[in-house]
Structures are given as structure tokens and as C-alpha cells.
Regions:
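Phosphate-coordination/substrate-recognition cap region in phosphate-metabolizing enzymes
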Residues: 4-6, 10-33, 69-164, 169-171, ...
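Beta-strand elements within well-structured catalytic alpha/beta cores of enzymes
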Residues: 35-39, 86, 112, 206-220, ...
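Glycine-rich N-terminal loop/short-helix segment of MobA-like nucleotidyltransferase
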Residues: 44-57
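Surface-exposed cleft-lining segments at the edges of enzyme active sites
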Residues: 54, 150, 170-187
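Short catalytic helix/loop segments, enriched in acidic residues and glycine
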Residues: 54-72
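Amphipathic, non-transmembrane alpha-helical scaffold segments
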Residues: 61, 65, 86, 90, ...
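GST-like fold's C-terminal all-alpha helical module
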Residues: 182-214
Length: 249
């Protein structure tokens, strides 16, 4: 545990076989600790009002900014020094990363942004309050959409007021642009970037910070820790929470 109380920081440790062996040159070599920290963004305006944000570019609340600053100070307190950082292209994650890096005096490190670290796309649920969605769908169906690993929400259509396809950040995605995602689809969208951009940096000995979103981090934890599909529903990452240090498989 890196901290307790309001920060509710969850520490998750994993044994690294593949990465440790490659770093040391053999499968039987002793494993070196390889660090990566997963940081969920601070509270957003739609977290506070309990609306489905998905890919809508919602900013942080004052509380969220404070959570991000506290996360950075906590990282500094525990001696985390990063070589690079990664974040989604959504401002709640971007601002959280900026703030945490500033608070830990690491604002100068290289940062990479990618849509693949965006929050799960909630499709037609996007923008609805949890209360309105429950009234429309019923409590049981809404729970399936939210927590069922392979259950896709109804897709977002072009007449949706928050239609993702109109955003220039995503114009070149073509068929890769999601209209709504199950947790499984979110998992499958995140992993290519994980293996192409993050894992090679860790293999190269770099210390990495990733600022992302609740469902993205849940999917990564599932992948790293082998969490069963049905058990993933019980994992929740608080806003402003760091998961780390991780030694990665």
C-alpha cells in the first residue's frame, strides 16, 4: 500500500518472468524490479454528476484537480522517478497527468497520447445520468451493460448530440472508431498499444507512468493479474488512485 485514507491508493504487485528474463539475458536469471504506475484521472465533472462520460471530453472538478496534485505529491514522497508517461487524448486524463507531473517536479519527461487509452466507449448511454439510464433500461439491464464483460451497449449513432465521429482527433480511425464497447472490446483496443509502446519501454529499463481511465485500468489489471471475466465486476479504481508499482508479465 502506498497510502491509506482519502487517497485509497491500491498497490498491485506482479511477478515478471518475460520482462525480467529479457532484461537480464536469460530465463533463469534473477528478476529485476520493473516499475510502471497506472494512475486514474481525478474526479471529472460527470463523475460528480454520475453521468456516462465515455469518449466525451469532460474536464476535472476542483476536487479532481486536488486529487491529481495529491497523487503527484505522493509519487514524489515515495521516490518515483519516471522516464516517460502515457495518457489518453481526453482532457481529464491529460490534465491529471500534467498536474501529477508538475506536483512531482517531473513536468519535463516525454509524454505520449493515444486514443487507445481512452475510456470505454459507452455508445448510446453516453451523456445519460445513471438515474435516467436505469429508468430507461431497468436496473438489471443497466447493470449488465455496465459490468457484463462481453455485453455491448446500444451503439451511438450519427444523430447523437455527442457523436464521436465529428471530433477531429478521431477522423482517421475509420473502421477502428468504436460506436460503443463492451469491456472485452475495450480490453482488445487497449492491448495493442500496451504491447507496442509501453511494454518495450519497460523492457528497456524505463520507469513508466500511465494516466488513464477506470475501465482501461480495470482491463489492464485483468490482463496482468488473470482476473476472471465475472470477477472483474468487483474491481473498481477510485479517482486519483495509483496502481503500482507493478512488475509486469
Amino acid at each position: 500500500m502506498l497510502a491509506s485514507g482519502p487517497q485509497r491508493v491500491r498497490a498491485l504487485s506482479y511477478l515478471s518472468k518475460e520482462l525480467g528474463a529479457k532484461a537480464k539475458g536469460g530465463a533463469d536469471a534473477p528478476l529485476e524490479p520493473l516499475r510502471i504506475v497506472l494512475l486514474r484521472h481525478g474526479e471529472s465533472e460527470w463523475n460528480a454528476s454520475k453521468r456516462f462520460s465515455g469518449w466525451v471530453d469532460i474536464d476535472l472538478t476542483d476536487k479532481g484537480r486536488l486529487e491529481a496534485a495529491r497523487a503527484g505529491k505522493l509519487l514524489k514522497l515515495h521516490g518515483y522517478e519516471f522516464d516517460e508517461a502515457h495518457a489518453s487524448v481526453l482532457k481529464r486524463a491529460v490534465r491529471t497527468l500534467w498536474t501529477a507531473l508538475h506536483s512531482s517536479n517531473q513536468h519535463w519527461i516525454p509524454v505520449k497520447h493515444t486514443w487507445r487509452l481512452n475510456e470505454r466507449h459507452y455508445g448510446a448511454l453516453t451523456g445519460l445520468s445513471k438515474t435516467d439510464a436505469e429508468e430507461q433500461l431497468g436496473k438489471e439491464m443497466l447493470l449488465k451493460y455496465r459490468r457484463g464483460y462481453a455485453v455491448e451497449p446500444l451503439p451511438m449513432t450519427e444523430d447523437h448530440p455527442m457523436w464521436t465521429g465529428a471530433d477531429r482527433r478521431y477522423r482517421d480511425l475509420g473502421p477502428l472508431l468504436p460506436m460503443g464497447e463492451s469491456l472485452r472490446q475495450c480490453h482488445d483496443r487497449v492491448l495493442p498499444y500496451w504491447y507496442e509502446s509501453i511494454v518495450p519501454s519497460v523492457r528497456g529499463g524505463k520507469q513508466v507512468l500511465v494516466a488513464a481511465h477506470n475501465n482501461v485500468i480495470r482491463c489492464l489489471c485483468k490482463h496482468l493479474d488473470g482476473i476472471a471475466d465475472d470477477d472483474l465486476r468487483h474491481l473498481e479504481i477510485p479517482t486519483g488512485c495509483e496502481c503500482g508499482p507493478l512488475s509486469l508479465d
